[in-house]
């Protein structure tokens, strides 16, 4: 997360005002999933392990069993975990990282274009997954051009 100077107003995440002194506190509260995962990994297993190796997440235990539970919710085959990254579609990669974000148990999940590479059935599973995360107390902020997906969200802001 970089800074774009504000011309007016403030940004708060939870009760924390965003500024240079609080950025690390806020980063600990957010799971971020970009539209395109430009990570230099050969194996999905390595891609999944990265967030758990980061300093801010080292206290979060990794569980293959929990990962597979989330895979099931998102319509992903378990064997994806042992494949090469280049054998996995963009939509599958994004859903894999959604599963990882849920495992990190952050209060805020930010995701860019979560349905851009998905069919209608997978889109429905992702939307249902977001709803379950919200029921568990997480907020999900998604940027999307998919009007069908957006119509299933609790709040919609059009820009």
Predicted regions: what they are:
Residues 109-113:
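Catalytic Walker B motif of ABC-type/P-loop ATPase nucleotide-binding domains
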Residues 98-99:
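Hydrophobic anchor residue at the start of the ABC signature
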Residues 6-18, 26:
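Conserved ABC transporter NBD signature motif
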Residues 42-57:
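Q-loop/switch helix immediately C-terminal to the Walker
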Residues 1:
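Helix-to-loop junction immediately C-terminal to a conserved catalytic motif
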